[in-house]
Amino acid sequence: MLLAASDQSVVSTIRDVVQRWGGNFWIRDQVNWKHEILKWKRDRGTVAHLTMYGQNLPNVIDQLDTDRLMVVVGAEKVPPDLFRLADYNVAITNQPHSEIAALSIFLDRVQKGQELAADFSGRMRIVGNVNEKVGVKRSEPIE
């Protein structure tokens, strides 16, 4: 995760979640977003910008190169340069919606639901249960 702003609470929260629950996820803050996008594209990466002003996801999803995909989600007024730099401006819907909702739906569609069966290597693991919350440490047996 590249964060243009400086927000130590977000950085520490993300790092804590990865440590406890696992996954291949990292975060850097105070980055120059334009520099990072240009660098990504120079390295032959694809940039998908999630925006309600873009092309609808079903119309572009098969064109996305998901091997080297940078997903950009604007958290504030998005500069016009971002629309021009992105290889794809993608809309989950052309109606107002939250950024996290757009990212969640986009990632689910790109991964074709396979992320739902992923098992991460963190210290903790969730065990699905109908009646209660069950979280166990990896060293404990799972029943």
PLM regions with names:
Residues 6, 52, 94:
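Flexible loop residues that form catalytic
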Residues 16, 41, 105, 109-113, ...:
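Short amphipathic alpha-helical patches
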Residues 29, 49, 90-92, 128:
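Structural signal for conserved beta-strand scaffold positions within catalytic alpha/beta enzyme cores
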Residues 113-143:
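Internal, active-site/partner-interface "lid" segment
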